[in-house]
Structures are given as C-alpha cells and as structure tokens.
C-alpha cells in the first residue's frame, strides 16, 4: 500500500525526509507534510432525469511548520520537488532562528486501524450504476403520494487518498471513501406547500446503493409528508426542543458554539 502512495504522489521516502529538513532549516520546532488526491462525482436528478453530472479532482500537498506556537503554512498543487521545496521554504519563514536542526527521528510507518471492508478503486464509484438507482427512487416517490409536485435527487461519491509525514518520523497513508444520497420532495395540499429532505451518508462506495437504503429513503419521505403539512408555528416564548443525532448538531453549534469560541479566543 505504501508503494502505491509513493507512485501516486511521485515522491520517495528520501524526498520526504529532505523536505522535513528544508522545513526545519530556519529553526522550526515541528513540521509535517500532508499530500492528498481526492476525486468527487455528483449526479443530480430533476424532472425525473439525471441531467447534471459533475466530476472534480483535487491534488496537491501542504507543508506546515510550527515555531513557539506560531504556524507557517504553504501548499502546492504539484508534487514536483522544485515546487515542494519552495513550499517548505515558505512555511519555514515562520521560524525566526537561523540555526535549524536536521531531522533525526527514523522513518516509521504507522499501522492504523482499517475501518473499511475493502480497498476502493475508481470502479467502485462508477457513475452509470447510480443513474438507475436515483430514477427508481424518484418513480417510487411520485407513485407513493399524489401531493408531491417536485422531486430533486442527488448522489455524491468521493474518494480521498492521504499521505502524511512529520518531523517525528511518523508516516501513514489512508483512503477515505464517502458516498451520500439526498432526496428533497416538495408537496402541496389545500394551498399549503412545504418540503422534506432525506439524506444518507456512509463511508462506502457503490455498495451503499442497496434496495434496503432505497426503501428507507422512500418510506421516510412518504411518512413525513402528512406530519409536515399538519405542522403549525409554535407560540412565542420558551419551549422544549428535542434534537436528533446528525445534522441538528449544526443548529446547536450555530446557536451557542460561536459564542463559546468568542469567549475562549
């Protein structure tokens, strides 16, 4: 696995060590390099058809140097040594000392826990296997409730490959798959129009697209429609709020988190 990442980023163990020496040359206390190759594919369904497909690729490396609590950071979208050395020198400017020490820690690959059942490739995120899945969910929602007037579906799949090395000699590689399916339905009854969104995300590839997951999405939206249409505005004043796991944590952060950040900084 380690050799695969060296080939992907076109860099060697010896070059990583050289970059750490370059980053610490001005007297930094600590330095690390973070290389990332990420691909993302997004399909959007509107009016019963998948009419938008987007593919993104992000590639590059960031180098960080820390000196007395100050941080210098620089990045490059190329892993050519000329550009990486320039990034290391730029990040090193945070250190004011001129007497840096060369890296002495041995190169030590870390054995990290494997959280995924397989090693993913581009084939595990093949675009056309998702088009039929999105259209099937759309059709089931349309047939399930005649109050639905519009449906928007989206799938997003990404795979990130990470390579990390620091001035302590610690080295590791990681692969991070992430796949999401989101459906929003707009429905109307007796002059009242509202909407409901269901989203599912897993650290998986295309094996996420199962009949069971489709059932969950369809059933959740169809069961929510009468509840949402019957909902009314609450009275003003204090009231108990029940928050579910997941996305509602963002609401909690926005409500009180920023105030705490201001206090603690």
Where does each model-flagged region fall?
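Active-site bordering "gate/hinge" segments
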Residues: 1-265
């Amino acid at each position: 696995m380690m050799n695969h990442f060296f080939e992907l980023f076109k860099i060697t163990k010896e070059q990583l060590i050289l970059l750490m020496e370059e980053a610490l040359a001005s007297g930094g206390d600590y330095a690390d390099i973070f290389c990332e190759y990420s691909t993302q594919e997004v399909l959007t369904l509107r009016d019963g058809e998948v009419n938008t497909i987007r593919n993104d690729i992000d590639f590059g490396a960031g180098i960080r140097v820390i000196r007395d609590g100050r941080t210098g950071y620089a990045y490059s979208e190329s892993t050519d040594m000329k550009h990486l050395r320039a990034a290391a020198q730029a990040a090193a400017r945070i250190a004011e000392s001129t007497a840096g020490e060369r890296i002495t820690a041995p190169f030590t690959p870390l054995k990290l826990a494997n959280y995924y059942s397989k090693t993913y490739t581009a084939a595990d995120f093949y675009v056309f296997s998702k088009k039929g899945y999105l259209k099937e969910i759309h059709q089931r929602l349309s047939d399930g409730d005649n109050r639905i007037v519009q449906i928007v579906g989206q799938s997003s799949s990404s795979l990130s490959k990470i390579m990390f090395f620091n001035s302590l000699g610690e080295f590791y590689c990681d692969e991070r798959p992430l796949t999401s399916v989101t459906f929003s339905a707009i429905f109307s009854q007796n002059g009242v129009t509202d909407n409901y969104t269901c989203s599912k995300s897993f650290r998986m590839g295309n094996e996420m697209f199962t009949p069971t997951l489709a059932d969950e999405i369809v059933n959740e939206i169809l069961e929510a429609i009468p509840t949402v249409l019957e909902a009314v505005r609450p009275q003003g004043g204090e009231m108990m709020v029940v928050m579910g796991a997941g996305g509602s944590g963002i609401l909690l952060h926005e409500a009180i988190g920023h105030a705490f950040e201001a206090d603690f900084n």
